[in-house]
Amino acid sequence: MTTVDSNTTAPEPVVDPNAVSVTINGKVVAARKGEMIIAAADRTDDFIPRFCYHPRMEPVGMCRQCLVEVVGPRGPMMVVSCMTPVADGQVVNTATEGVKKAQEGMLELLLANHPLDCPVCDKGGECPLQDQAFSHGPGESRFVEEKRHYEK
């Protein structure tokens, strides 16, 4: 039989000094200081489109496909989620109309000079760019200039 001393208090919960609280699409997420927004969003199952981001590499932010909206003191602002670290109390939206429009615009620019010969391409259905165009693309391009052609 064990006895409990009523004078003992429960230990204080350990608080991680490197943790910050971020709200992503209305969900509160615990993230590490310095962690990029895109990595924190991945843990909430809020997929942010990307081409140049890989969790095991340094972020470069070249494709701009991972744009999200961060609500700040001066209102919402578009930021590149693979290059922007989380901050305590930050509010991030990944699926607003403005974000979707910006992501479509970036994808449209990536496709602007891309050859549109997907049926005969060597990648034939295994192309991340093609997958992104189908899932996050605008459907049609505003650019009608002639594309670059390469010898096969």
Kindly label every feature range from the protein language model.
Residues 1-21:
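Terminal leader/tail segments of proteins
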Residues 2-4, 8-9, 64-152:
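Fe-S ferredoxin-like electron-transfer domains
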Residues 20-88, 97-102:
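N-terminal cofactor/phosphate-binding cores enriched in small/glycine residues
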